[in-house]
């Protein structure tokens, strides 16, 4: 994103779309669970979904964690929902939300320009699809709003690190989610180290249930003021990285706002909110990990798990 085009008409459209989506329902996080045999709008029972998810896990050789919450019916689907998984870039929604809530005042902080260098891009493992563009490096600065946006829409690691720096480091994200009632999710390191994803590591992790509820509070609840909630949702709606993951598994006419993540050991994640036509939204998370360090990520597993959720809850 070039600084001179930081407020394209697309953003206005996305913000309006986000506002319409937000008007559909407000998530009130609860503890209710659907019975195993319960049926709602979807064609399958929760117990059927759990069996299908177990089958996907066996076939893939990965560990699969899933949690989804239908805000209209209160039905849930849970599979390894309370196990810890590496979070990877799913954290970027949290860091951007923390900037909006804790640092921005009436949009003034969002318009501040942040200086950065090629070294910053390289320290983020060279993963700066927007910050590393020649035209952006030539100016050596992007606004806070632009950096938050591209950290989500393009999963720009350099942008995320710059926002972590403004927040005071990764621990600020942990403090932020604790203030939302999330006692599980934690961020300890910077990009790219946080993606090391060794089996058994507890740092830089979350659980499917915890991150689903936190995303729900941010997008559908009152964790952010309405203006910030619309802006965060517009970034999630504009995400470009989930085409082979959630987007591939959900029906084409379901609006999707999400954030992906990937790391070593085949870690491959997607978390977000989807709005079926004429229905209350569904908040959903799929987290996966394997046991071999150089294992390939399995986008199809994430897409297939999302498809099970859509067929069960949709």
Curated annotation (Swiss-Prot):
Enzyme Commission identifier(s): 3.5.2.6
First and last residue of the signal peptide: 1-39
Region of interest (Disordered), ranges: 31-50
Domain of life: Bacteria
PTM characteristics: Predicted to be exported by the Tat system. The position of the signal peptide cleavage has been experimentally proven.
Catalytic reaction list: a beta-lactam + H2O = a substituted beta-amino acid
InterPro entries, per database record: Beta-lactam/transpept-like, Beta-lactam_cat, Beta-lactam_class-A, Beta-lactam_class-A_AS, TAT_signal
Catalytic site: 89 (acyl-ester intermediate)
An example molecular function term from Gene Ontology annotations: beta-lactamase activity
Residues noted as binding substrate in the record, renumbered to the chain: 259-261
Note: The class A beta-lactamase family has a specific amino-acid numbering system, sometimes called Ambler or ABL numbering and often misspelt as Amber. A multiple sequence alignment was used to derive a consensus sequence and then the consensus was numbered taking into account insertions and deletions. This allows use of identical numbers, e.g. for active site residues, despite differences in protein length. UniProt always uses natural numbering of residues, hence there appear to be differences in numbering between this entry and some papers.
Family: Belongs to the class-A beta-lactamase family.
Name used for this protein in its record: Beta-lactamase
